[in-house]
UniProtKB/Swiss-Prot annotation, chain A:
Pfam families: Arf (PF00025). InterPro entries: ARL2/3, P-loop_NTPase, Small_GTP-bd, Small_GTPase_ARF/SAR. Belongs to the small GTPase superfamily. Arf family. Found in a complex with ARL3, RP2 and UNC119 (or UNC119B); RP2 induces hydrolysis of GTP ARL3 in the complex, leading to the release of UNC119 (or UNC119B). Interacts with RP2; interaction is direct and stimulated with the activated GTP-bound form of ARL3. Interacts with SYS1. Interacts with ARL2BP; the GTP-bound form interacts with ARL2BP. Microtubule-associated protein. Does not interact with TBCC. Interacts with RP2. Interacts with PDE6D; the interaction occurs specifically with the GTP-bound form of ARL3. It is found in: Golgi apparatus membrane; Cytoplasm, Cytoskeleton, Spindle; Nucleus; Cytoplasm, Cytoskeleton, Microtubule organizing center, Centrosome. GTP binds at residues 24-31, 48, 67-71, 126-129, 159-161. GO terms for biological process: cilium assembly; Golgi to plasma membrane transport; intraciliary transport; kidney development; mitotic cytokinesis; photoreceptor cell development; post-Golgi vesicle-mediated transport; protein localization to ciliary membrane. Transmembrane segments: none annotated. This is ADP-ribosylation factor-like protein 3. One of its GO terms (cellular component) is Golgi apparatus. Small GTP-binding protein which cycles between an inactive GDP-bound and an active GTP-bound form, and the rate of cycling is regulated by guanine nucleotide exchange factors (GEF) and GTPase-activating proteins (GAP). Required for normal cytokinesis and cilia signaling. Requires assistance from GTPase-activating proteins (GAPs) like RP2 and PDE6D, in order to cycle between inactive GDP-bound and active GTP-bound forms. Required for targeting proteins to the cilium, including myristoylated NPHP3 and prenylated INPP5E. GO terms for molecular function: GDP binding; GTP binding; GTPase activity; magnesium ion binding; microtubule binding. It comes from Rattus norvegicus (Rat).
From Swiss-Prot, chain B:
Its main location: cytoplasm. Gene3D superfamilies: YVTN repeat-like/Quinoprotein amine dehydrogenase. It comes from Rattus norvegicus. This is Dynein assembly factor with WD repeat domains 1. It is found in: Cytoplasm, Cytoskeleton, Flagellum basal body; Cytoplasm, Cytoskeleton, Flagellum axoneme.
């Protein structure tokens, strides 16, 4: 990739290119989701100490997906990546009920960010392959998603591990690329 | 005019003259780019005296000694074998660029964690953390050869000037409206130039902290910028496929180099300022006559985008690094490809000569940096150990230390 290609992906993308920001707590499954999207091997994934960028072709769009590490110490740096974001994807570990409050807090703060204002948000209720996973509806309620008024949003249950639900979510992304209210 | 002293410059070979003119101390250089161990010293000194009135008969002996010292240096075969000296868990997010001061005594690293750190090369100890930027610190530089100041350019649209000794911030240069992605001090260290994604470059006065001039005219992001050896001209390379030569004092456009058919990745002058080398995503490098602005050669052969290119210190050789995973060496005079460097298992994003000009250093997405023999193209060493791709790498001025910076948040000292 190199620094130069990061600069190329940084510049305001032409119409058919979409900049997607993938955020969520550590261990939510962001990198697994990214690799699943790129049809790459997901058997050896370690905590992301920085970021990963992948470009995926989908329905005539080039989706440039930025996966940013979710550990607490690097969350303050998320804002470095907000510029020019077309879609925000927020990933939640549906089986980690102890951290629902924490993940809700982070999402609320993201939605208050000026640089992300009006950016459509897709919430992936990930890890649905686990028996202990909370259903998407329960998570939506817990996070008060229905109170979001300033943008389009969607919650999609999925398993980044098996790939189930991932494509449905990306279909929504492609439909709502241009829904960013100017 | 009165000559005060004579100094040696090893790379590229030359003699620096310190002289007094109208009560002011000035310096100029006699470049000896063609010097080789077999050059006849007496003939050369005679030629120098013909063109340089400051070198009077009484200085002949001294100049002869200096030339002999340079020849000795050229004779010393530089075949340093590098080993991993230290791994520095430098930052909590990926590194961007690394740079050494001329003495090689310290180096700096920029990072996505919004800081720039100053390190002691000998011990690997952190000397300062330069904090204050509000976004990624991307472009960094020492004001070499002095090395007492550091400039940092950030995605926060500002550039900051720091004391290398104390870590104190002297100035914050505000004015760009998008990320700053390249910067350079002029050789006199009176001005710092910044290039931005806002399509402009700006020159800033180091003393006053004021903007001197804005270079406007590019139609897309400026991603590369460099001064010529005198500091009179500056070139900018842009994603608009062109390179522009500017007069550094007036900010006027001197030439627009049109010919590449994709984004520019690098643009620089040769040491004697006669040539400009440009690398592009169109898989070629071009050589331009710096005076006329005309293209004199197109260097072809790579199968994918050129990500970096450079001259050696004398300007006789050119090296190119490509996304095709290979690098090439060209003769700047004949424009012929001399060797092809094969072995990397991913794209090569950085390439540089050692100051002696007999080794090349490459950094790649395959997580390794490699040392190559310039003439044979043989890979001499693979610097392995980083766990993610290498974003930047550099030799020190002596050519016996290498610093690598990686996406794995660490940097490594090899010596």
């Amino acid at each position: 990739m190199g620094l130069l290609s990061i600069l190329r992906k940084l510049k305001s993308a032409p119409d058919q290119e979409v900049r997607i920001l993938l955020l969520g707590l550590d261990n939510a499954g962001k990198t697994t989701l990214l690799k699943q999207l790129a049809s790459e091997d997901i058997s050896h994934i370690t905590p992301t100490q920085g970021f990963n960028i992948k470009s995926v072709q989908s329905q005539g769009f080039k989706l440039n997906v930025w996966d940013i590490g979710g550990q607490r110490k690097i969350r303050p740096y998320w804002r470095s990546y907000f510029e020019n974001t077309d879609i925000l994807i927020y990933v939640i570990d549906s089986a980690d009920r102890k951290r629902f409050e924490e993940t809700g807090q982070e999402l609320t703060e993201l939605l208050e960010e000026e640089k992300l204002s009006c950016v459509p948000v897709l919430v992936f209720a990930n890890k649905q392959d686990l028996l202990t996973a909370a259903p998407a509806a329960e998570i939506a309620e817990g996070l008060n998603l229905h109170t979001i008024r300033d943008r389009v949003w969607q919650i999609q249950s999925c398993s980044a591990l098996t790939g189930e639900g991932v494509q449905d979510g990306m279909n929504w992304v492609c439909k709502n690329v241009n829904a960013k209210k100017k | 005019m009165k000559l005060k002293s004579l100094l040696l410059r090893y790379y590229p070979p030359g003699i620096m003259l310190e002289y007094e003119k109208g009560g002011e101390l000035k310096t100029k250089s006699i470049d000896l780019l063609e010097l080789s161990p077999s050059t006849d010293v007496n003939t050369l000194v005679g030629e120098i005296q013909k063109v340089e009135p400051l070198i009077t008969a009484s200085r002949t002996k001294q100049v002869r000694l200096l030339v002999q010292r340079l020849q000795e240096k050229l004779r010393q075969h530089c075949d340093h074998n590098f080993y991993l000296f230290k791994v520095l868990r430098a930052h909590i997010l990926p590194l961007t660029n690394v740079a050494l001061n001329k003495a090689g005594s310290c180096f700096i690293t920029g990072s996505y964690d919004r800081t720039c750190k100053v390190w002691d090369t000998a011990s690997g100890e952190e000397l300062h953390t330069l904090e204050g930027h509000r976004n990624v610190v991307y472009a960094i530089a020492f004001n070499n050869p002095y090395g007492d100041k550091i400039a940092t350019g950030s995605f926060d649209k500002t550039c900051k000037l720091w004391s290398a000794e104390t870590g104190k911030c002297y100035h914050t240069f505000r004015g760009h409206t998008a990320e700053i992605v390249c910067l350079s001090f002029n050789p006199q260290s009176t001005v710092v130039a910044t290039g931005s994604m806002d399509t402009t470059a700006k020159l800033w006065d180091i003393q006053s902290g004021e903007e001197v001039v804005t270079l406007t005219g590019h139609l897309a992001e400026i991603i590369s910028l460099s001064f010529d050896t005198s500091g009179d001209r500056i070139i900018t390379g842009s994603f608009d496929h062109t390179v522009v030569v500017w007069d550094a004092s007036t900010g006027r456009k001197v030439h627009t180099l049109i010919g590449h058919c994709a984004e520019i990745s690098s643009a620089l002058f040769s040491w004697d300022c006669s040539l400009i080398l440009t690398g592009s995503m169109d898989k070629t490098c071009m050589l331009w006559d710096a005076t006329s602005g005309k293209c004199v050669a197109t260097l072809t052969g790579h199968d994918d985008e050129i990500l970096d290119s450079c001259f050696d210190y004398t300007g006789k050789l050119i090296a190119t690094a490509s996304a095709d995973g290979t690098a090439r060496v060209y003769n700047a005079t004949t424009r012929k490809c001399i060797t092809k460097l094969e072995g990397h298992e991913g794209e090569i994003s950085k390439i540089s000569f050692n100051p002696q000009g007999n080794r090349l250093l490459t950094g790649s997405s395959d997580k390794t940096a490699r040392i190559w023999d310039v003439q044979t193209g043989q890979c001499l060493q693979v610097l392995e150990g980083h766990t993610d791709e290498i974003f930047s790498c550099a030799f020190n001025y002596k050519g016996n230390i290498v610093i690598t910076g990686s996406k794995d948040n660490s940097c490594r000292i090899w010596r």
